[in-house]
A protein has these predicted regions:
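A short, conserved acidic/glycine-rich loop-to-beta-strand motif
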Residues: 137-147
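Short acidic-glycine loop/turn motifs at beta-strand connectors
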Residues: 158-164
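Short beta-strand/turn micro-motifs composed of small residues
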Residues: 22, 68, 118, 145-146
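Conserved N-terminal catalytic core of the sugar/cofactor nucleotidyltransferase
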Residues: 46-119, 124, 129, 159, ...
Length: 212
């Protein structure tokens, strides 16, 4: 499913645990992440990950699991000091394991449907609607996607195998879905992961696709 830019009114009728992957090095934000871990990079007066958690708390969740690694003590110190209306659990990742490997550390800790999110994306959407869609479709994993439109500022030429022009399009506009980094996931996915094995979440999705 995908999200758009409509403003959503808060309503909390569910309480779903949220797992946030907060252990990455944040290399794309260097040199800022030389000082701060990516989750604590401020947006306005508070860190990006706190924005994310506040929004989930406002709509759908009172409990969070932060998978931490890089500069994890700074993240723990921050959330241990602030006033908050939700519970924060820390899952220590001793070495980089990717999203899938990090989730394997949650075996026995999550026994119900949960939300999985990156630590640097804020989704403005009706989370309950996404959850209900996930349950209605009986999915193991539901990926939240964003529809993007990009206009190419040039004429686009499609060339055949022998070099002949097959089609010309002047400044076409392309539409495609992108992965937002937010998912609804069943606990079965955690239980079936190999312990402490580095694996990305797209690889996990592909495995389930191949297995039908």
């Amino acid at each position: 499913i995908f999200w758009n830019d409509e403003e959503i009114e808060p309503k909390k009728t569910l309480n779903i645990p949220v797992v946030i992957m907060a252990g990455g090095l944040g290399t794309r934000l260097y040199p800022y992440t030389k000082i701060l871990p990516k989750p604590l990079i401020p947006i306005g007066e508070i860190p990006i990950v706190e924005h994310i958690m506040n929004r989930f708390n406002q709509y759908i969740s009172n409990e969070f699991f932060l998978v931490v690694n890089h500069k994890k003590n700074m993240i723990k110190a921050y959330f241990n000091e602030i006033e908050k209306n939700y519970k924060v659990n820390y899952v220590n990742e001793e070495e980089p394991l990717g999203t899938g490997g990090g989730l394997s550390l949650l075996k026995g800790k999550i026994v119900s449907t949960f939300i999985l999110s990156n630590c640097d994306i804020l989704i403005e959407e009706d989370y309950e609607k996404i959850y209900n869609f996930h349950k209605k479709e009986n999915n193991l994993i539901t990926m939240v996607c964003s529809l993007k439109n990009i206009k190419i500022p040039y004429g686009v030429i499609e060339i055949g195998k022998t070099g002949e022009i097959e089609e010309m399009r002047e400044k076409p506009e392309l539409s495609f879905f992108t992965n937002t980094g937010m998912y609804i996931v069943e606990p079965k996915v955690i239980n079936e992961l190999e312990d402490n094995k580095a694996i990305g979440f797209p690889d996990i999705i592909e495995k389930y696709k191949q297995n039908g």
